[in-house]
From Swiss-Prot:
It comes from the Bacteria. The gene is nfo. The keyword Ligase does not apply. This is Probable endonuclease 4. SMART domains: AP2Ec. Zn(2+) 1 binds at H69, H113, E148. Its EC number is 3.1.21.2. Endonuclease IV plays a role in DNA repair. It cleaves phosphodiester bonds at apurinic or apyrimidinic (AP) sites, generating a 3'-hydroxyl group and a 5'-terminal sugar phosphate. The keyword DNA damage applies. Pfam families: AP_endonuc_2. Keywords: DNA damage, DNA repair, Endonuclease, Hydrolase, Metal-binding, Nuclease, Zinc. GO terms for biological process: base-excision repair.
Length: 283
């Protein structure tokens, strides 16, 4: 039976050790966190001097890759040059912080929402994202950036596999960029994971390559196929349902990846319970 690397998105309050204790409490073997505030301010809780020891402790405890989530405020596809420049600089700083964790032997990725073109058109937006990532990697390149599959809300770029492939093709150092597969977003974008799992995986492989998918955001969907809503539901309580998640955790290609829950904490034990539920679905 395959052991899942799984956990949720955790608060950084209290610093590195408190972060790990929260993971222990939910029974996790992977997790996500924001490296700075949602508005982009650097975190006072995450002292860079403690990053290497944190990474060494995770490695010693057998954790799967961390999937750190960049703040939503970053928009590499935006019109505002000052905001775009901030996103490039801040993402490079995030990579520098996380490089110490990776140097200690613990794999870590940083996940980003690719960006929104805000009326400039998807082609322009995708080009700007590629160019922005190239600038980021000129400053710092010790950690892989994962582009998240998006639901297609508003002017989001990355609303389908082909757009993500276009962005990745524009990145000069291909080894620096991969993909996070968000189950809710992929369904909401119009890919029928519920009824055509194999077909969706073939499309993903043809457009991007399954080997470039490095992490999974494990979320059910409130509104479902083609809704473009991006509204997460708790596991088994949405349009995907338990049969889909059973298929996912028994797919040898996908089940080896770190799985991050981004579902609503309805009770203090929601994520602990969902982690146990998903592990219980493994054959």
């Amino acid at each position: 039976m395959m052991e899942l690397y799984i956990g949720s998105h955790l608060s950084t309050a209290g610093g590195w050790n408190a972060l790990l204790e929260r993971s222990h409490e939910e029974g996790g073997t992977a997790f996500a966190f924001f490296p700075r505030s949602p508005y982009g301010k650097r975190s006072k809780a995450l002292d860079p001097a403690g990053a290497a020891a944190f990474g060494a402790r995770l490695k010693a405890e057998g954790y799967g890759p961390l999937v750190v989530h960049a703040p939503y405020v970053y928009n590499l596809a935006g019109k505002d040059e000052a905001k775009r420049a901030f996103a490039i600089e801040a993402l490079a700083e995030d990579i520098e912080l996380l490089t110490a964790i990776r140097a200690a032997g613990q794999e870590v990725y940083i996940n980003i929402h690719p960006g929104a073109h805000v009326g400039q058109g998807a082609e322009t937006g995708c080009r700007l994202i590629s160019e922005g990532l190239n600038q980021v990697f000129e400053r710092a390149d010790g950690v892989m950036v994962l582009l998240e599959t998006m639901a297609g809300k508003g002017t989001e770029c990355g609303r389908n596999f082909d757009e993500l492939a276009t962005i990745m093709d524009g990145v000069e150092n291909k080894a620096n960029v991969g993909v996070t597969f968000d189950t809710c977003h992929v369904l909401d974008a119009g890919y029928d994971l519920e009824n055509d799992y194999d077909g969706v995986m073939r499309q993903l492989d043809e457009a991007i390559g399954l080997a470039r998918v490095k992490a999974i955001h494990v979320n059910d969907s409130q509104f479902g196929l083609g809704s473009h809503k991006d509204r997460h539901a708790n596991i088994g309580e949405g349009q995907l349902g338990i049969p889909f998640f059973t298929r996912l955790v028994n797919d040898p290609t996908m089940a080896k990846l770190p799985m991050i829950l981004e579902t609503k904490e309805q009770t203090p034990t929601t994520h602990r319970d969902e982690i146990a539920l998903l592990r219980g679905l493994v054959d």
